[in-house]
Regions:
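Early extracytoplasmic/domain-onset interaction patches
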Residues: 9-51, 121
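C-terminal, non-catalytic "cap/extension" segments appended to globular domains
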Residues: 394, 402-405
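Acidic/His/Gly-enriched intrinsically disordered linker/tail segments
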Residues: 297-306, 310-393
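Long amphipathic alpha-helical segments
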Residues: 223, 237-241, 355-361, 396
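Juxtacatalytic substrate-recognition/specificity segment
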Residues: 188-316
Length: 405
């Protein structure tokens, strides 16, 4: 057993009580308080580094502010690891049975005056030395009393501003984002006769932003039906498509086992503007497909027992490429895209890859090993981008054609 594992092997009983508070949405700062059961002695804690679906060690540790540890009413000295800025060392004093952890997290691109898109890995520390599936957390969220929320987490209680969720392992918590807002709408997408509920939860900066049409709603209903017809299975108790419709938050999506965290590129105009809807229509099918390909089943090397160990992303052409292919197929089969739009999207990606000069020197597998979502656009054709999405889709189209021939 390593020294770090040895000093943390004394995992204390009881769940960690984690509270994230947003007292002033206009301030865009989350106030974090953890109460962690401990025993005296050396303790090492991690801030989540390798977040599943990000494919790189990009946990926003640089945004953490005001970190403070205390026990028995006394503030404790702590030290960051010299070789890993995501790791913190401290000593729990004799007689202490719980550790209080406090810090602030400025959530610039996930909070507006009307909404919050919360991912728990931004607001938690966890113990080194034991798998995250063995570390229980009971999360609470404090938001304005008139806000509503959606999540795959099960609610224990709500008392005014405070929502307390039922305890879950830390890996499940990180896999279960929450959206909340003044303007909230939930659609039940559950197919007739099914006991497994699927929901589309929406938040926006205005009531108009979440005004989905009857036709769009029907298409999302068909998405669930078509996914069931494609996969012939489900592996979740329920599923929540969490959709943020704001012009003031980050864009894109992140997959989770029982939910997806989707932020429309069209923002508040996604449902109102047909052009924006066409651009965003494949986002939710893509992340929903990941519940099968990437969560329920994932390539070797992309599963780790905690969020500190590096992933081995060599098979991202399977994880992402196959998901693009199947997700876009579901987008068309559900009616979110027309068949012509699907063909146009595929033709565009094929044209881009056919003229990708960087393929002469850089193989596809290297783009999976050196993932860089923040790479500049300059010289992208020669340098290559994260082509395991586009070229991966074309590869799986070829595989599908081979199987069918």
């Amino acid at each position: 057993m390593s020294c770090m594992a040895a000093e943390n092997a004394q995992t204390a009983p009881g769940p960690v009580a984690l509270t994230a508070s947003l007292p002033d949405p206009g301030q865009k700062i989350l106030y974090v308080h953890e109460v962690m059961p401990v025993t005296p002695g050396p303790l090492t804690l991690y801030y989540p580094k390798w977040i599943p679906g990000d494919h790189s060690p990009d946990g926003p540790i640089g945004d953490m502010m005001g970190l403070e540890f205390s026990a028995n009413g006394q503030r404790l000295t702590w030290q960051r690891d010299e070789l890993d800025r995501f790791t913190f060392h401290l000593t729990v004093p004799e007689g202490a049975r719980q550790l209080d952890i406090r810090f602030e997290f400025p959530s610039r691109d996930r909070v507006t005056t009307n909404l919050l898109d919360l991912t728990w890995d931004h607001v938690a520390l966890y113990r080194a030395g034991s798998p995250t599936k063995d570390q229980m957390f009971q999360p609470s969220l404090v938001i304005p009393a008139d806000w509503h929320y959606g999540s795959a987490l099960q609610t224990d209680t709500r008392d005014g501003k405070r929502i307390t969720f039922k305890p879950v392992p830390f890996n499940t918590l990180v896999d279960s984002p929450v959206i909340a807002g003044k303007h909230f709408r939930q659609l039940d997408l559950t197919p007739k006769g099914s006991s497994v509920h699927r929901y589309l939860d929406m938040i926006g900066d205005s009531a108009a932003a979440i005004a989905i049409s009857d036709q769009q709603s029907a298409d999302f209903h068909r998405l669930i039906e078509q996914a069931q017809a494609l996969f012939h299975s489900h592996h979740y108790d329920s599923y929540h498509l969490l959709l943020t419709l704001s012009d003031h938050t980050a864009k894109g999506g992140l997959e989770h086992h029982q939910s997806s965290d989707d932020k429309a590129r069209g923002g508040s105009k996604m449902f109102a503007d047909p052009a924006h809807f066409m651009l965003d229509a494949s986002l939710l099918p893509h992340e929903y497909t990941h519940s099968w390909n990437g969560k329920f089943m994932r390539p070797k090397g992309l599963w780790r027992s905690d969020f500190e160990q590096p992933e081995k992303p060599k098979l991202l052409w399977v994880y992402e490429g196959l998901t693009v292919y199947l997700g876009d197929t579901l987008t068309a089969r559900s009616g979110l895209w027309s068949p012509e739009t699907w063909r146009d999207a595929l033709a565009y990606r094929a044209a881009v890859m056919a003229h990708r000069t960087g393929r002469a020197w850089r193989p596809l597998v290297d783009t999976t090993i050196a993932v860089d979502y923040g790479a500049p656009e300059a010289w992208a054709n020669w340098r290559r981008q994260n082509d395991f999405y586009r070229e991966g889709e074309l590869l799986w189209l070829a595989v599908d054609m081979k199987i069918r021939s």
